């Protein structure tokens, strides 16, 4: 058996179905308890001068191994389990010993063990990326198969070692390489590893979705359905896997799902088939192109209808309530059938723009006669034009999406791996790029964003390095617009409604303004709502920028870290806080009559520490 009794090896090399998280961080899932016990039971070697070369290799006792080899031990000689010294060094990640044995003539691709594996196979099973890199640099062949018929990339997939998968593919290993059964890595992932990864990770490398294996002629989608792997089915459908290919039994993926009686997968496949069938109709394709516009129009009409019902000439609030319930029921049907799930995230944006539209119409139609010629009117017009401009700039400007070509991605992966930096702190497994400082992957936009602040619901856009300053002005002018409409509402009531606030109090006053103009009260409530959240966010943003020098994401992350630490972290004492004036100058990229000069940093390509000449501080990621 390969590697019995060693604390730093995987003792079970079978390839059955594995639970989610199997093999992550370089440790096999089934290894956890057995390996922990083995490590505890493994005795310490007090005197290494008498141990044999196999044990010395396992423990990484370099001097003892060197002594025995120079005394005449053949490094190619396998032990009684048919395992070479290079295998033992590889599985225990003994880099210095591997270099030494290879220099003494060890065969880098020597087969050994029960599974007839190479040292590279053993290193991959354990997730030892540095060892994999070293063996490949010394000529190891990643295309060789072991006794189970798996090559290097298949083992990396089965054990869910994503960094090794990325490195092998970047070094030229085909993502569509087949094992002895004609199965690609994507097929093995969909069938053997329950969960979204590494199926989703493999799809980043554009594997063939519709290739079939030799024996069953199943596609990756067939294998995912056969295993009941819901996450893999979802990933493959999203990537565009065919629903019509039949296997050797003449079964489509839906036929297999029906046979297995997996109701969730059946629903997913039928829904996807219906959506793809609708794509054939020109009207449906036109509706998809106009989804956002239709969503906006629906929101505008719905908000008008709500106000119309409230302003309806009837004293029966029961009738108005029934009409409102009916309205919301009817309008909820439209997004469900005509607007895709991905575009529903723009619903708050449509609500905001619809609110501003009716705010403007109310001001122009109802409030204009009372405020015509006054400076408040022109201030309102300026505020709403500025709001629309900065909303557009916030939405249309690239927030700082990090981009890289396929070749650049592979070069980055190789560079990071060979420098020991290929981990989740510096590498994005979704974008396959090196992450700049202060960046974060947004799962809504599906991209890494430089100097990430948040994904704003109200703009439907990420807020980052490229559009953060526009976002501040967007909040400011939205607060101004809502503030003017609140002021205009009270001016309107004082001019057009008979109120007795001083005589009868607040409750009577509210009844009087509701009876006078429910529409104006409705618009006031909308304006008050938008004024509240926009003003709160504006003040919060300005505080973070001027006094902390942090983004919203960084502030929240530091606060979470502080909860798990004995000593409370100070948000003011961060490398990014350069003082009130310098923080503002850096953020808005403007000086102050030569007293303060901004430091220009391109956060989309900033991977190392930054030296700030103004304060002689070193900026680091938080």
Curated annotation (Swiss-Prot):
It holds the Pfam family Ank_2. It catalyses: L-cysteinyl-[protein] + hexadecanoyl-CoA = S-hexadecanoyl-L-cysteinyl-[protein] + CoA. Its main location: Golgi. Its EC number is 2.3.1.225. Residues 313-320, 369-370, 492-518 are lumenal. ANK repeats lie at residues 43-78, 81-110, 115-144, 148-177, 181-211, 216-245, 249-277. Residues 426-476 form the DHHC domain. The keyword Acyltransferase applies. GO terms for molecular function: magnesium ion transmembrane transporter activity; palmitoyltransferase activity; protein-cysteine S-palmitoyltransferase activity. It is an enzyme of class 2 (transferase). The active site is at residue 456. The modification N-acetylmethionine is found at residue 1. Residues 1-291, 342-347, 392-470, 540-622 are cytoplasmic. Keywords: Acetylation, Acyltransferase, ANK repeat, Cytoplasmic vesicle, Golgi apparatus, Lipoprotein, Membrane, Palmitate, Repeat, Transferase, Transmembrane, Transmembrane helix. Belongs to the DHHC palmitoyltransferase family. AKR/ZDHHC17 subfamily. Palmitoyltransferase that could catalyze the addition of palmitate onto various protein substrates. Palmitoyltransferase for HTT and GAD2. May play a role in Mg(2+) transport. The DHHC domain is required for palmitoyltransferase activity. Interacts (via ANK repeats) with CLIP3. Interacts (via ANK repeats) with DNAJC5 (via C-terminus). Interacts (via ANK repeats) with HTT. Interacts (via ANK repeats) with MAP6. Interacts (via ANK repeats) with SNAP23. Interacts (via ANK repeats) with SNAP25. May interact (via ANK repeats) with SPRED2. This is Palmitoyltransferase ZDHHC13. It comes from Pongo abelii. The gene is ZDHHC13.
